[in-house]
């Protein structure tokens, strides 16, 4: 399966995405020798487990949406989404400045536009212009769903959505997070399962709709969403 075949199943409005993914791969691997960005370095694995995986949410994102990626790391899922969906307005948030430096460098190499923020999620949310300011919030960060929901749902506009990227089997995790999601103003709309190409595993998108405003006390500070999740 070549790149064109792999990505043909995804909604895309960008005709030169193959070239941009090639640049992304080369820059990621080169920069990774200086800064630890990814443990996955095999080309096929990067394309499937990082690039293709990141793009799975494309079909659920409205045209021209304001999108923020929380805990983006090396740009996943936000940058691959922007590569195939140049219409979205993308914002990337990460707590480590070395990752933001890479993402600013990458933006010039890819010749695409996005904004970067060196910030913890709770600090980013404390800014009035960000709180409930985005149609779509995405995150592939490694954390329990109830923790991610507390960091991400406060950023979602009423009627917008939070899309959490998860591994294959998340039924128990979703069930254990339902109360937290309700408290935060969300409602699980869909749990969508995918098989990655080349038998590289399965993935799940948990799509949560914002049905009411999030109480002002969330997200809590002092790392409480992780230490004592809702």
Enumerate the predicted regions with their spans.
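Short glycine-dipeptide loop
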Residues: 156-162
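Short strand-turn motif at the edge of the Rossmann-like AdoMet-binding core
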Residues: 165-169, 193
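Short alpha-helix immediately C-terminal to the canonical SAM-binding loop
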Residues: 99-101, 170, 174
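Residue-level signal for inorganic ion chemistry
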Residues: 28, 81, 103, 166, ...
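Conserved SAM/SAH cofactor-binding pocket of Class I
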Residues: 55-143, 149
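Short loop/edge segments at beta-strand edges and connector loops
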Residues: 41, 118-120, 190-192
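Class I SAM-dependent transferase core
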Residues: 1-64, 98-101, 105-113
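SAM/dcSAM-binding transferase cores
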Residues: 175-230
């Amino acid at each position: 399966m070549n790149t064109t075949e792999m990505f043909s199943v995804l909604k895309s409005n960008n005709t030169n995405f193959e070239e941009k993914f090639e640049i992304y791969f080369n820059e990621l691997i080169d920069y990774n020798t200086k800064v630890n960005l990814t443990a996955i370095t095999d080309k096929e694995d990067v394309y499937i487990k990082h690039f293709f995986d990141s793009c799975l949410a494309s079909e659920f994102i409205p045209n021209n949406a304001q999108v923020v990626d929380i805990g983006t790391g090396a740009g996943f899922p936000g940058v691959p989404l922007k590569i195939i969906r140049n219409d979205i307005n993308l914002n990337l948030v990460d707590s480590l400045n070395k990752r933001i430096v890479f993402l600013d460098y990458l933006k010039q190499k890819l010749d695409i536009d996005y904004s970067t923020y060196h910030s913890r999620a709770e600090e980013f949310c404390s800014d009035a212009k960000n709180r409930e300011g985005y149609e779509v919030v995405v995150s592939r960060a490694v954390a329990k769903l109830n923790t991610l929901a507390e960091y991400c749902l406060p950023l979602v506009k009423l009627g917008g959505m939070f899309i959490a990227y998860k591994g294959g089997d998340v039924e128990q995790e979703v069930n254990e997070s339902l109360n937290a999601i309700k408290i935060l103003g969300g409602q699980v709309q869909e749990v969508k399962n995918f098989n990655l190409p080349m038998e590289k595993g399965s993935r799940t998108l948990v799509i949560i709709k914002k049905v009411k405003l999030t109480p002002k006390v969330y997200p809590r500070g002092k790392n409480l969403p992780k230490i004592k999740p809702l």
